[in-house]
């Protein structure tokens, strides 16, 4: 009966959002597993359970899709306080911890390695990664530092310095294929980086000494407990 006919209207905003996430999740997984060169748009469409036409309606080519994957991954990046932080060091410490935890996820690590290995053949990947870093890391930190009292004409350079400090240990381990830092190591490095940036080397050194003192005290307590059990 005509009165019972169900019409298919345009997909809702929520439907579109879910489908987009489905496409980008599938694409990130495929790029991470197989590399940029090997993945085809048809494979992504099949993996995401959408038509090739739907995929091409959203992304003109594979590079556009890869670029969208980078932005999609960056949506998990932490945010800094909107207003001027009362404690700049604490805000930057928390941000440093959160950003490294995101970058240390399996998919982020594999995408980073993909860019490193395939950028010689596809230099556009490197440019896309740099643009993504500027948009989702450098620009937000720059804006935060300006609100925290840094001069407008130098805030971006200071933002880059802070990020270099905060990400240095993660970058070193990635470069030399070493185990990624543990949660405790991430927290310690983030605290030292923020202290160095805000207060200089003396503050960072004091934090390092405090960490070492804590390790020694923990070791002494462990030995005392072990002896007591004998």
Summary of predicted features, one role per range:
Residues 6-11:
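Arg/Lys-rich, glycine/proline-spaced intrinsically disordered segments
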Residues 22, 26-64, 68:
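Helix-turn-helix
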Residues 25, 89-105, 109, 113-117, ...:
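Amphipathic alpha-helical segments that line or abut small-molecule/effector binding pockets
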Residues 62, 69, 73, 92, ...:
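Hydrophobic/aromatic residues within well-ordered alpha-helical segments
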Residues 67-96, 103, 141-143:
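Amphipathic alpha-helical linker/stalk segments
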Residues 90, 110, 123-149, 156, ...:
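Amphipathic alpha-helical packing segments from all-alpha helical-bundle domains
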Residues 103-131, 171-176:
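Amphipathic alpha-helical segments used for helix-helix packing
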Residues 131, 146-195, 204-222, 230:
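Hydrophobic/aromatic-rich alpha-helical bundle segments in the mid-to-C-terminal region
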């Amino acid at each position: 009966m005509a009165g019972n006919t169900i019409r298919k209207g345009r997909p809702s905003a929520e439907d579109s959002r879910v489908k987009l996430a489905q496409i980008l999740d599938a694409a990130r997984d495929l790029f991470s597993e197989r590399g940029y060169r090997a993945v085809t748009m048809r494979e992504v469409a099949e993996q995401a359970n959408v038509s090739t036409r739907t995929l091409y309606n959203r992304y003109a080519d594979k590079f556009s899709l890869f670029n969208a994957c980078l932005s999609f991954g960056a949506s998990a990046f932490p945010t800094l306080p909107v207003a001027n932080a009362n404690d700049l060091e604490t805000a930057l410490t928390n941000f440093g911890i959160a950003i490294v935890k995101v970058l240390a996820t399996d998919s982020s690590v594999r995408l980073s390695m993909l860019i490193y290995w395939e950028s010689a053949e596809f230099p556009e990947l490197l440019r896309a990664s740099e643009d993504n870093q500027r948009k989702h890391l450098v620009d937000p930190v720059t804006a935060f530092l300006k609100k925290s009292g840094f001069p407008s004409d130098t805030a971006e350079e200071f933002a880059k310095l802070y990020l270099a400090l905060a990400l240095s240990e993660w970058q070193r381990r990635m470069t030399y294929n070493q185990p990624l830092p543990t949660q405790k190591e991430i927290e310690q490095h983030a605290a030292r980086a923020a202290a160095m940036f805000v207060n200089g080397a003396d503050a960072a050194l004091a934090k390092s000494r405090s960490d070492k003192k804590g390790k020694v005290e923990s070791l002494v307590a462990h030995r005392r407990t072990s002896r007591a059990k004998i």
